[in-house]
C-alpha cells in the first residue's frame, strides 16, 4: 500500500511546486498564492523609528511600531537595504551582503524582528541589490588591485574606453558616464548607476553562484521574499550597446528555481521598467520567472490621467500587459522611494503632468520624473482618496509607501530622491516623535502645511475623519474583496470621459468599482449583471433597470459595489 501511495504523493508535490501555466482563477491552488491578496508597506529602517536616541531609525524602533502596522492592516513589510554600506546611495551601494549595518542593529535584533513580525502575521521582504556593489566592497577593491584576483571578473572591465561610454545612464542629468576609469586597475569598469556602484557581471558563473548564496542566507534568516533591484541590468550582457542591450533571459528562471527550492512560498518581486511586449521575458512564458513585477507602465499613464482627466491611455496601459501567466501578479503603486518615472510618456504628455504636478524645476528629476510625495503633489483630499481607492481596486497587489497613509509631505531641499525619504512623523513632539536626538541624520519636515506638528500619526488616530482612519478602512475593504487579486476583470464601457468602471468576477461574486478622474460631477451608465448592488462604502443598495446601472458620481468620486446574489 505504501509503495502504491508514493508515486501519487510525489506527483502531488510536483504539482504544487511548479508554476501553473493554464488554469482559471477559480482553482483552489490560487488560495495559496499569498502575494495576490497581501498589502505591502515599503519603509526604510533609518527613517522609520529611532529607539535609542542616535538620530537614526533602527530595527528596535521598527519592532516597536509593528502593532501600528498591524492596526493599519499591513501583512507584508518591504524593507529598503539595511546591509553594511558607505550609504552614498542610501544603502543601494552594498559593501557586505551578509551583514546588518550596525547603525540599524545586530543580527540578534533582526532575528527578533522576524519573530515579532511572524507573531503578528506580518511577512518581511527585503530589497536585494544584486546588480552592483559599492566600490568599497572587498570584491571590487581586490578586483581593482589584482587582475588575477578571482574577483576581477566579478565585474566588467575594458582597457580602452568603449565608444558608448556615456550612454545608458540610469540617472541622466546627474551621471556623466557608464564606463569610469580606475587608476589602480588601469582600466575602465562598467556601472549603470553612479560611478561608486560598479555592476556585477552575471555572465560569470561565480557571480551567479555567489548571488544564490546571498539569497539562501537571507531566506535562512526568515525573510519571505525579495524585491530584486534593477532586473534588466542584472541580465544584461556586458559590452553590448547599453541603449539596445542584449539580455541573458535564462538568469531569471535560474534565480526563481533556487529561491523556490529553498522556500516554496518565497516571493520574487522584480523591478523591471519595461514595455508590455517584454513582460513575459521577466514573468516567464509559463510563470517560471518573477512571481510579481511593479507595473511601471500603467503607473505613468495613471499620473497622466490624474493630471488631465484623459484616462484612455491609462485604460490601454491596463489592458496591454494583462496577458501574464496565471500564477504571476502585477504590483500597483502610486509612489515609491524613487521619482515618478514618466519616461514612457510622449514629451507632450510628460509636459502636461509636469504642469499639473511638478511645475518647478526643483520638483523634477533625471529629465523624466517628479520627486514629490503624493499629498502635496495632488493637493486635494478628495483627489487623494480617489487615487488611493483606485490603487486598492486595481487588478493586482497594492504597495504603499510609509507615511502616505497620513499624507506626509516632501523636502525639496534634499538631494535628488531623498526628498521623499524623510523621517516618519509619529506625533507633534520633538522631531515628530521619530527620535529624541538633538539632531536627526536627515531632517524631519518641520515647516509648512506638512510639518510634523500638523501631519502626524497620533493626531490622526484621534480623528475619525482623518486620512489615516480612512486608509485603515479602505485596506480593510480591499481584504474583503479577494476577487480583485484573484478574479477575472474587465473595463466596462460607459461613454463618459474620465470615469473608469471595472468589473471583477470570482466564483459567485461580482464587484464593480467606479472612479471619476474628472473635476466635475458626472452621471455614469453601463451594462451590469444582476439587479441589486450593495455599496460597500456608503452601505446602501442600488438597483439596475433593464440591466443598466446608472449612478451619479461627484468630482474625484469613487464607489465600490458588490452584486447581491439571491437564491
Labelled PLM ranges:
Residues 22-567:
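Active-site and adjacent substrate-binding regions of carbohydrate-active enzymes
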Residues 1-24:
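Bacterial Sec-dependent N-terminal signal peptides
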